[in-house]
Amino acid sequence: LMLPADVAKKAATPPVSALTVNPAPADSACLQAFREAAEKRLSTSKRTALLADFLVLRHGLRTALQTWVKEVPMAHATMLMGKGIFDERQSGFYGTYSGSASAAPVKEAIEGADTVLCIGTRFTDTLTAGFTHQLTPDQTIEVQPHASRVGDVWFTGIPMREAIETLTALCKTYVRDTRAPLDHSGFSFPTIEGALTQESFWRTLQTFIRPGDIILADQGTSAFGAIDLRLPADVNFIVQPLWGSIGYTLAAAFGAQTACPNRRVIVLTGDGAAQLTIQELGSMLRDKQRPIILVLNNEGYTVERAIHGPEQRYNDIALWNWTQIPQALSLAPQAECWRVSEAEALAEVLDKVAHHERLSLIEVMLPKADIPPLLSALTKALEARNNA
């Protein structure tokens, strides 16, 4: 894209309100046909569940989904990129759906339903453990940004918001959740001691998260471990397994903190991923940003070791002295750094940075071959598919 050099100097009228794009109104005939088809399906459904994904967030409809499950109690879950849509500590929320790699209660709640309302979903390989999801077209009602589907029939020209409003109204009439609600009120973990593992790290981190946080989890053990976190209300969870570009979170965190300087930004990244975009740490220090960065140090590309070549040198990386990196990237770094290898030490450091005033970098020492349960299930599914 080439522009004349003087374009940037031309006078411009600033907008008086936020720049928004209002979708075209729904095609009334298509909307009515969709309503009738959905009503026919829901009126005979004994068990209905809701599965939401990231396109709900992209189109600003999180509040609409939250209102929906509040007004119509039913089993609901998200896919990994949709984490944060719901208050995950409320009854009715089952967890993160990942095909055959899903926890048993989540898998049964979604795949065992007569009708699954799929809102803004994308069933990609890494989100479904290699396309192992068991959801048939006849079982699902799907809502996408500009079209919706009931069974095998697509209805075009229907904005997502209007499709959601239509389904919410129908659910109030036809959906009756007879399952005992899940009780997350006592969701907590006891004090954990000993050397850090994937399990003890995520359990310790769980107690640190609070409403309003912005959490960015890099592709790899960070994202696959974070799937089991129970997020409170109003947490923005940013992850990108759709493209799987490691190193994404440091740059994205710089943007998130720039956009929301008064919110707490938490970065979860691996040592291998962080090495690819570490220069953005310098940008954060230059702008006096104060994210909380947890570098999961497992001596290389652990996610790649799990998939292929656990002992191959191409999955090794240069070992850095992470707690000294801010000194190299700023002449006057406003940063605090720690290296922790014990669960108790991590808990103490997290307590210190809970109300921090400067950038915090925590190097978390983890076993080289330790992987989260979801990653283990995913690699087994991929291996089975490759060997078929």
Give the ranges of each region predicted by the language model.
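Glycine-rich, anion-gripping cofactor-binding loops and their flanking helix/strand elements
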Residues: A52-V143, L229-R263, Q275-Q279, G309-E311, ...
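Terminal amphipathic helices with adjacent charged low-complexity linkers/tails
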Residues: M2-C30, Q139-T178
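Glycine-rich ThDP/TPP pyrophosphate-binding loop and its adjacent helix/strand module
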Residues: P23-E39, T44, T323, A332-S360, ...
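Conserved thiamine diphosphate
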Residues: R149, T173-P190, I307-V349
